[in-house]
Amino acid sequence: MIKLLFNVSPELYREYRQPILEALRRRNIEAMTGLPGDIAPEEIDYVIHATGGPVDDFGVFTKARAVLSLWAGVEKIVGNRTLTQPLCRMVESGLRQGMVEWVVAHTLRAHLGMDRYVCQKPLAWEQHVPPLATDRSVTVLGLGELGSAAALTLAGLGFRVTGWARRAREIAGVRCLAGADRLPEALATAEILVAILPETPDTINLLDAERLALLPAGSCILNAGRGSLIDDTALIAALDRGQVTNATLDVFRTEPLSANHPFWSHPGVTISPHVAAATRVQSASDAIADNIERAESGAPLLHLVDRALSY
């Protein structure tokens, strides 16, 4: 029997404990679980972690074979110097599907100009015929598991999709660019810009005033990566001068977004309260169980975090 420590809040423990146990049983693995203090640290085989968990010294888990994150983002833990165990980020089908649906919905909303009809004056019959998707350029920043899935789906709808990442990628139907020197090229054609990048030292304020100025006039931005990707002040300035017509933001530097933040009152900002890619309990439990099964059988862990890259 393996021993799992849930380094999570009591609420998350109640939500995930039984689904993960059931997912493990389907794989013929029996487990004992507990919160910090329930099981001796030196007896723990795996740590299931979420931001805000009470333990931040992972050095006590001398037997632990891996730390398995419940969330896709690991920027809050990756720099922890006591964490010497393999760290795995969450990648699961529900997370991927949720992100694709959110990106497609808001890309189509921007592409079709739906806001003008939702907000139009009563009795105003004003026709605005948008171009077809084949004549609309979309750039996706970040081509990991989620970004690649979104880019592939948008290309399947006919959009002219450019993808940009730190390292070279190949995605059917997507023009892929890589490296800092190709970022201006990726931004220059982005009538709709979709950001799905993680937070790393290289991505903080990636979209600053200088880079926002490279976007085509009247572009739209969707940010479902991390709030730190965009300089808030520079974005508001770009909206005010018409460089950007709308920004749909799912992530923010501080969450929940403070009540006095100017994003709330800006007519060009749509606030989506971090719902683009929520972790689904059942599919996430299967993903955790899959990785534990792999480790128990001696197979390589999936979705290992590269500490040098911070994701």
Model-identified regions with their sequence ranges:
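N-terminal glycine-/charge-rich "phosphate-binding" loop or analogous flexible N-terminal tail
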Residues: 1-46
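Short acidic low-complexity segments
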Residues: 31-43, 56-57, 174-189
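Phosphate/diphosphate ligand-binding glycine-rich loop within oxidoreductases
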Residues: 45-118
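Short, well-ordered coil/turn residues at beta-beta hairpins
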Residues: 50, 70, 196-199, 224, ...
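Glycine-rich NAD(P)-binding loop of Rossmann-like domains
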Residues: 116-149, 176
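NAD(P)-binding Rossmann-fold cofactor-contacting core
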Residues: 156-173
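Rossmann-like adenosine-cofactor binding region
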Residues: 168-262
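Rossmann-like dinucleotide-binding domain for NAD(H)/NADP(H)
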Residues: 218, 224-311
